Amino acid sequence: MKVKMIMLLFQILAILTLKSDSADVPDGYIQENVALRGRATQSAQLRGEHAGISHASNAIDGNRDSYFYHGSCSHTEGDNPLWRVDLLQVYTITSVTITNRGDCCGERISGARILIGKHLENNGINNPECSTINIMAAGETRTFHCPQPMIGRYVTVYLPKTGTLHLCEVEVNVLFPAPC
């Protein structure tokens, strides 16, 4: 428990040394994508011919390939579709990087909200918002910086309308002290 608290304090200290307009990692720290260690879920699984290549876990496979039919993207649809990663422990998160589907349908992600928190109440939709995805080009990879460091175990991408949500990669960025 003490080690986790010390790590959390180091993360917060590192985050506070960042300039508000800078995406640079401060000296003495490394940025790591902790989503690779997590477990992903989504509100619905695509059915039919492409069901086997649209799993939630495809969005945390470390592959930014944005062509859906290569099998590296998630796909969920319906009323208020959502995708979520359980990071399996609490982290102090500075930003989330998303790769949008590139072979078509880039506009479908517009209006999605990135939520971060420690609770699964209402499928994580009640957790605080890091950012909203207003417009994102097909195949674009973009980092969404939270207005302040956010503490959470669950990162949810939620589309508050009837539609389709494609995510080809989701990276959850955390700062750690660099090894000596």
UniProtKB/Swiss-Prot annotation:
The UniProt entry's sequence similarity note says: Belongs to the fucolectin family.
Keywords from the named record: Calcium, Disulfide bond, Lectin, Metal-binding, Secreted, Signal
The extra comment attached to this record reads: Binds 1 calcium ion per monomer.
In this chain, Ca(2+) is annotated as bound at 58, 61, 63, 72, 168-169
Q: Which InterPro entries match?
A: BG_Antigen-Binding_Lectin, FTP1, Galactose-bd-like_sf
> Could you tell me one molecular function GO term of this UniProt entry?
calcium ion binding
| Disulfide bonds, paired cysteine numbers | 73-168, 104-105, 130-146
Signal peptide feature range:
1-22
Sorted alphabetically, the Gene Ontology BP terms of this entry are: regulation of cellular defense response; regulation of complement activation, lectin pathway; regulation of innate immune response
Q: Where does alpha-L-fucose bind?
A: 75, 101, 108
What does this gene product do?
A: Acts as a defensive agent. Recognizes blood group fucosylated oligosaccharides including A, B, H and Lewis B-type antigens. Does not recognize Lewis A antigen and has low affinity for monovalent haptens.
Major localization class: secreted
One GO term describing the cellular component: extracellular space
Quaternary structure note? Homotrimer.
Could you tell me which species this protein originates from?
Anguilla japonica (Japanese eel)
Q: Where in the cell is it found?
A: Secreted, Extracellular space
Answer whether the UniProt record assigns the keyword Kinase to this protein: no
Which tissues is it found in, per the record? Answer: Parenchymal hepatocytes.
| Keyword Signal set for record | yes
Q: Where is this motif: Cell attachment site?
A: 101-103
Q: What is this protein called?
A: Fucolectin-2
Q: According to the UniProt record, where is the region F5/8 type C-like?
A: 31-179
